[in-house]
Amino acid sequence: MTKKTVPVQVQSDLLWEPRSIFWGARLQIAREFRELTQKTLADKVSASPALISLCEAGIKSPSLDLVQAFGEVLGFEPEFFSHEVGDLFHEEQCSFRHRRSAQERVKAKIRAHATLIGMVIGRLKSLLRFPSQDIPCFPLSRGTASEVEEAAESCRKHWKLGIDGPLMQVGRVFERAGVVIVPHLVNTTKIDAFSRCGPTAVIFLNKTIKSPSRWNFDICHEGGHLVMHGGIQTGSIETERAADRFASAFLMPKRAFSRDFSMGDAADWKHIFAMKRRWNASAAAIVRRAFDLGLIDAVRYRKAYKQMSFQKWTVKGEPEEPAFQEPELLADALISLGTRVKVTIDDLRQQLHFTPETFREVTGVVVPPAKLKLSPVIPFSR
């Protein structure tokens, strides 16, 4: 977990230095983004692990050449370390899907990545108009299924979505509420998604998951954490089950879903996949929703999952997936640079003091090469 540090003076006897303040929290963020231990970083910059620890804690001031070495190894310009972290992503604000099976190193990398994305978004918000954050708060007092169902329906009503039909653009619903969806979570099978509720609300999705119906469910699952679990440590069986139930109820409201499901044969896969096309949810989520609502019994539920396992849908993915919906908010904002505002993508990168490669890794956007500026040529007199 990244702790708040105080700035220290950079030690240098060089004639020029970009800035003399060093923030250790930024060093920890950059190191964790690269998944390096303090010892590994120390070896790469020819320092001791103890010195790295003291620099991150704000106790020891690094020399300028060490700051430059940090930047070269971690992929940041030296000036990156001379600014305070305005919006640090703390562990208690973050929710990880499949958190219990994930290594702390991976979770630390994702939190660091999210903090860096927050820096990008903060700059973009100073240049462009973003949707105001409008996440309703429906904390659970009892944690019952009926309470979660009520929270999901209340959230739909708050956003004026109604509870009588499916959602056509699931990601857009949350982005209109000011939640930034980032589609390139670190490449891992241990975490499906990640979210954070704070001054900048974000949902990260796993780019290795190729199922749009699973993405829809993951967005709503993380949305459930944002709506129900603000300020609460998540990752327990209880909070994960509540978020799953929220996602199911938000995607497929009880009354409308029950009506549609009852119009066909519960044992007919053609009916299940027709429901999938209509509700933009996976067949697995539909079967589970039907079981939770008492529309099928335990025997039918277990038979359905056995059939899905036999077809290898749980491993290779289901057929008849809905069309993929690319998140829009962050991409549109970055595309607007250099057109709607004078600041270009490379200007933004330089303001953040990321290297071009780091900017691509953080945002998923390649920095275009700077245009060559031609100087006027003064002809020789003849």
Positions of predicted regions on the chain:
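Active-site hotspot residues in diverse enzymes, especially metal/ion-binding acidic/histidine motifs
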Residues: 1-382
